[in-house]
């Protein structure tokens, strides 16, 4: 007798046959010896429909006989203050000290 948890339930596949693509591994030439290296090119409007718009960061997982591409969510935009802080970090130590002193002056509660 089978357990109720071992009975297969019908389900719809996440990927329909209409969404399958057939590709062939081609090659690209590598300079300076022009050796051939394997290459796969993906292009088409279906990429954007699948969540891979131009500029999307992609995570690539490689296994034997399998490559999985996952679109990464867009990074949250930095606030204007954080962008300014990153700019200050690139300044010289003397200028960073001046910025710190300026912040100290404008944040002090004592009137002048």
UniProtKB/Swiss-Prot annotation:
Instruction: Kindly name one Pfam family recorded for this protein.
Output: SymE_toxin
EC class name = hydrolase
Compartments (UniProt record):
Cytoplasm
| The organism's place on the tree of life at top rank | Bacteria
- UniProt keyword annotation of rRNA-binding present: no
Annotated SpoVT-AbrB domain residues: 29-74
Q: Which residues form a coiled coil?
A: none
One GO MF term on file is: DNA binding
What HAMAP family would the database entry show?
A: Endoribonucl_SymE
Regarding protein family, the annotation reads: Belongs to the SymE family.
The protein depicted here goes by the name Endoribonuclease SymE
Organism, as annotated = Escherichia coli O127:H6 (strain E2348/69 / EPEC)
The record lists the lineage as: Bacteria, Pseudomonadati, Pseudomonadota, Gammaproteobacteria, Enterobacterales
What gene makes this protein?
symE
